[in-house]
């Protein structure tokens, strides 16, 4: 009796292994590429809530500078975030909203229209104050998905310390003497003498509060970690009783003459170079008509779990390169920027692995044995994805949208 049971189990085991060696489909690269291209066509239209591409209109001779500025800022921000995630081995959140977000850029109002800078006599040595007028977006307060504060750190060759830890605070409206006057948001360690760079902070909660309560919009404060002492970021050492001034300089906030030596010609040249680097907010909003659809038919997506990936085997599951040229591959002329992008796709066989990391695949194979009508073999699917920013026209109106999960970065068997 025991021998029969053991034999039956071994037969079931062998059948299961044989079945699990099959993949979702035979590896036909041309077929995969054609399907991926058509999927991208539908994906873009779906995310924009369009049933068909916008009508072709003559492309504008010149795109307004402010539109290009928003597009460039959004694109650069996404690239920076992707680089940080890669360095920290992090992944894009799997609960990313499906539909495209509209992107709005709000520049910091100039202190002085002619210079957009604070004169040296107006300096606060330990902090800077930055304010934004977001009143135009109040009617869309409930549609806010993300808000980023971006400020360009300038090179300061005269800095007395090579690096500082700067902190961003939301300035609060004090109700009484015991109420807090600021709320911590984030901090960054910056190299004061190094080449300039953009700094980005997630300020979604603060901007959301401003949109709902206008009187609470008192701006942001860029401050030192410990102005009453000297903080050394390299070893987290604090030198007491030694006040430290803010040595980091910011475009659009600090006067050029305080960090630039030379004649007026040099100073004017530096100001011109930094003229497009005003501190600004990038707001990403889900339009109302997309928001309603999102609430009634919310898409649930699989979490990006760690899985076995066959990167170095030609026939097995791995990332395959695919560049999409909007005009050539999709026949579209209505997307102005970019002209195309590296969409990539996942393809290849998923051999069966008897390990603790692939229990999901094992269950699927056993289920397939019991229910052969079901398609339950492990498939090669995308694991890490990144968003894409596009600039397009509907008629003569330019629109900038962020499309989530458009660029495949890695694959897994599932």
Curated annotation (Swiss-Prot):
InterPro entries in the record: Cystine-knot_cytokine, TGF-b_C, TGF-b_propeptide, TGF-beta, TGF-beta-rel, TGFb2, TGFb_CS
Annotated family: Belongs to the TGF-beta family.
Domain of life: Eukaryota
Disease as annotated in the protein's UniProt record: A chromosomal aberration involving TGFB2 is found in a family with Peters anomaly. Translocation t(1;7)(q41;p21) with HDAC9.
GO BP, one annotated term: face morphogenesis
Gene this protein is translated from: TGFB2
Protein name (record): Transforming growth factor beta-2 proprotein
UniProt entry keywords in alphabetical sequence: Aortic aneurysm, Chromosomal rearrangement, Cleavage on pair of basic residues, Disease variant, Disulfide bond, Extracellular matrix, Glycoprotein, Growth factor, Mitogen, Secreted, Signal
Gene Ontology cellular component terms for the protein in this record: axon; collagen-containing extracellular matrix; endosome; extracellular region; extracellular space; neuronal cell body; platelet alpha granule lumen
Residues bearing attached sugar chains per UniProt: 72, 140, 241
Keyword Ion transport carried by entry: no
CDD domains: TGF_beta_TGFB2 (cd19385)
Disulphide bond pairs: 309-318, 317-380, 346-411, 350-413
Signal sequence, renumbered to the chain: 1-20
Subunit architecture: Interacts with the serine proteases, HTRA1 and HTRA3. Interacts with ASPN. Interacts with MFAP5.
PROSITE patterns to which the protein is assigned, alphabetical: TGF_BETA_1, TGF_BETA_2
Gene Ontology molecular functions: amyloid-beta binding; cytokine activity; growth factor activity; protein homodimerization activity; signaling receptor binding; transforming growth factor beta receptor binding; type II transforming growth factor beta receptor binding; type III transforming growth factor beta receptor binding
């Amino acid at each position: 009796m025991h021998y029969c049971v053991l034999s039956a189990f071994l037969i079931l085991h062998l059948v299961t292994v044989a079945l699990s060696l099959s993949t979702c489909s035979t590896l036909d690269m041309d077929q995969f590429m054609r399907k991926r291209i058509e999927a991208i066509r539908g994906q873009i239209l779906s995310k924009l809530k369009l049933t068909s591409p916008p009508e072709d209109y003559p492309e504008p001779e010149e795109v307004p500078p402010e539109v290009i500025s928003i597009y460039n800022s959004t694109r650069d921000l996404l690239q920076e975030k992707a680089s940080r995630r890669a360095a920290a081995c992090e992944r894009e959140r799997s609960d990313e909203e499906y539909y495209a977000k509209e992107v709005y850029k709000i520049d910091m109002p100039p202190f002085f229209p002619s210079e957009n800078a604070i004169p040296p006599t107006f300096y606060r040595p330990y902090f800077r104050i930055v304010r934004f007028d977001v009143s135009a977006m109040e009617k869309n307060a409930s549609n806010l998905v993300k808000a980023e504060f971006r400020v360009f750190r300038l090179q300061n060759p005269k800095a007395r310390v090579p690096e500082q830890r700067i902190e961003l605070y939301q300035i609060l409206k004090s109700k009484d003497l015991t109420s807090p006057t600021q709320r911590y948001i984030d901090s960054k360690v910056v190299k004061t003498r190094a080449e300039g760079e953009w700094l980005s902070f997630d300020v979604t909660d603060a901007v959301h509060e401003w949109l709902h309560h206008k009187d609470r919009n008192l701006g942001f404060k860029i401050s030192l970690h410990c102005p009453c002492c000297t903080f050394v970021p390299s070893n987290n050492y604090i030198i007491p009783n030694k006040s430290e001034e803010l040595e980091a300089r910011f475009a659009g906030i600090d006067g050029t003459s305080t960090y630039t030596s030379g004649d007026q010609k040099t100073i004017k040249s530096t100001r011109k170079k930094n003229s497009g680097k005003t501190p600004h907010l990038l707001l990403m909003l889900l339009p109302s008509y997309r928001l309603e659809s999102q609430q009634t038919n919310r898409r649930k997506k699989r979490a990006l779990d760690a899985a076995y990936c066959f990167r170095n085997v030609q026939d097995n599951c791995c990332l395959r390169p695919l560049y999409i040229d909007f005009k050539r591959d999709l026949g579209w002329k209505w997307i102005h920027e970019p002209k195309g992008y590296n969409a990539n796709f996942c393809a290849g066989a998923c051999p069966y692995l008897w390990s603790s990391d692939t229990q999901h695949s094992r269950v699927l194979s056993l289920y397939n044995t019991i229910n052969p009508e079901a398609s339950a073999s492990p498939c090669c699917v995308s694991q890490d994805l990144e968003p894409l920013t596009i600039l397009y026209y509907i008629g003569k109106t330019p629109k900038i949208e962020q499309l989530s999960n458009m660029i495949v970065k890695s694959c897994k068997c599932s």
